[in-house]
Amino acid sequence: MSRISVENVKHVAHLARLAITDQEAEKFQKQLDAIVTFAEQLNELDTTNVKPTTHVLTMRNVMREDVPEQGLPVEEVLKNAPDHKENQIRVPAVLE
């Protein structure tokens, strides 16, 4: 029995604002159902002696050292801004 229905696929497509045909919905339903079936096989593995991990590699937080540097002068930054006022860059309103 399928775990993913065509209606599920159409619903998710609608939520994602994607227009899909009935043929595409059926194709995606089969593909998604195969993926879910494969993922469920992982539940059958015995992981009793396996430590929980959050990453497959042993390296964590490999980052370079932070080195503070002098920033650009305000005048230099404002030269590249299309519009500015009182040392601040003006941008078009995003929210009304």
UniProtKB/Swiss-Prot annotation:
One GO term (biological process): regulation of translational fidelity
Entry-linked InterPro entries: Asp/Glu-ADT_sf_sub_c (IPR036113), GatC (IPR003837)
EC number: 6.3.5.-
Domain of life: Bacteria
Alphabetized UniProt keyword annotations: ATP-binding, Ligase, Nucleotide-binding, Protein biosynthesis
Catalysed reactions, semicolon-separated: L-glutamyl-tRNA(Gln) + L-glutamine + ATP + H2O = L-glutaminyl-tRNA(Gln) + L-glutamate + ADP + phosphate + H(+); L-aspartyl-tRNA(Asn) + L-glutamine + ATP + H2O = L-asparaginyl-tRNA(Asn) + L-glutamate + ADP + phosphate + 2 H(+)
Gene3D superfamilies from the UniProt entry: Glu-tRNAGln amidotransferase C subunit, N-terminal domain
A GO term for molecular function: ATP binding
Function: Allows the formation of correctly charged Asn-tRNA(Asn) or Gln-tRNA(Gln) through the transamidation of misacylated Asp-tRNA(Asn) or Glu-tRNA(Gln) in organisms which lack either or both of asparaginyl-tRNA or glutaminyl-tRNA synthetases. The reaction takes place in the presence of glutamine and ATP through an activated phospho-Asp-tRNA(Asn) or phospho-Glu-tRNA(Gln).
HAMAP family: GatC
NCBIfam families with a match to the protein in the record: gatC
Quaternary structure annotation from Swiss-Prot or TrEMBL: Heterotrimer of A, B and C subunits.
Similarity comment: family membership: Belongs to the GatC family.
The protein's name: Aspartyl/glutamyl-tRNA(Asn/Gln) amidotransferase subunit C
Organism: Bacillus cytotoxicus (strain DSM 22905 / CIP 110041 / 391-98 / NVH 391-98)
